[in-house]
Amino acid sequence: MNNNYYVGLMSGTSMDGVDAVLVSFDGDQPSLIASHTEELPKALLSSLQKLCLPGNDEINRLGHLDRSMGKLFAKAVNALLETANIDKSQVIAIGSHGQTVRHMPNLEMGFTLQIGDPNTIAVETGIDVIADFRRKDIALGGQGAPLVPAFHQHVFGSPNHKRIILNIGGIANVTYLPGNNEDVTGFDTGPGNGLSDAWIQHQLSQPYDKDGAWAKSGTTDQKMLQHLLSHPYFALAAPKSTGRELFNQAWAEQQLSEFGHLSEADIQSTLLDLTCYSIANDALKLSENGELYVCGGGAYNSELMHRLHKLLPNYKVVTTSELGMDPQWVEGIAFAWLAMRYHQGLPGNLPAVTGASREAILGSFYPAD
């Protein structure tokens, strides 16, 4: 009987569900044993979206949602273990990212806040939980994000190839693996699926633009695209990170105010190109050529992938499936890996990526007993 499993839990800025993965780290590379996605109930999703923006009665709403998300995370874990026919005693720990509701690392007293009470997860599953991975890095002067580059370096690094690992969730982030372990870097490029998801939800009441079909039916407005790309964030040097606090529906609608003559489909196409151009511009700053491996929800958007191909002709643009890892589960596996690093007393951040003053063991421990 294998008693060396970890569970990874991820709910990203796109809020499209809770991903739960069961992972073994017995070999050189992590092995995905089972996976499960728990859908966010509509009422819970709506409450989360409201909490991500400034509003009234925030503390009461946060306290309630913290418990509610903890219960949903636990439900995802229990369903995962039932699917895999694995007993909780075989799992060393759960690595829970939580649901980000604020990420503001650049204030004088920078902070990040993820909810999904780890105590509730531990009690409801009977498994020890490691959570709160980002705040140690911020305490050390870092951005607290992105955290996945250390994992990307471990599993995707190659001494013979220049690789960029691109994760496209609500926000997009890149990890540059230049072929040596000294110069790894990573940062958030800007919007991922978040703006285009919000636009189609608002206009067509669809959760996302499947295969980018609606964007494909429109025509990008170059004036609007250049206006969006003029945002100061895109000119910032790394380390940098961003979130829904900056690139959200309210920001998009503010930018759209002078482009009311455009069709809804043209706006969708332009928002998709904002994602693609901001990614491509940063990729070309890192290297003129190489291999780009895409993971996250954006990997399944065929129009997005097509546009990246066109913008990066000297890159091999494929998904992480070519490296043996399903794009949907990469982030979940990364947080199982971070839990394993905590359990073994090993650092989980890359100071060159986040700007932290040193490496550190990330996370806090929440026992089931």
UniProtKB/Swiss-Prot annotation:
Pathway(s) the chain acts in: Amino-sugar metabolism; 1,6-anhydro-N-acetylmuramate degradation; Cell wall biogenesis; peptidoglycan recycling
Species this protein is from: Shewanella pealeana (strain ATCC 700345 / ANG-SQ1)
Entry protein name: Anhydro-N-acetylmuramic acid kinase
Function: Catalyzes the specific phosphorylation of 1,6-anhydro-N-acetylmuramic acid (anhMurNAc) with the simultaneous cleavage of the 1,6-anhydro ring, generating MurNAc-6-P. Is required for the utilization of anhMurNAc either imported from the medium or derived from its own cell wall murein, and thus plays a role in cell wall recycling.
Annotated Gene3D superfamilies: 3.30.420.40
Binding site for ATP: G12, T13, S14, M15, D16, G17, V18, D19
GO molecular function, one term: phosphotransferase activity, alcohol group as acceptor
Keyword vocabulary terms for this entry: ATP-binding, Carbohydrate metabolism, Kinase, Nucleotide-binding, Transferase
GO BP term (any one): amino sugar metabolic process
Name of the gene: anmK
EC category name: transferase
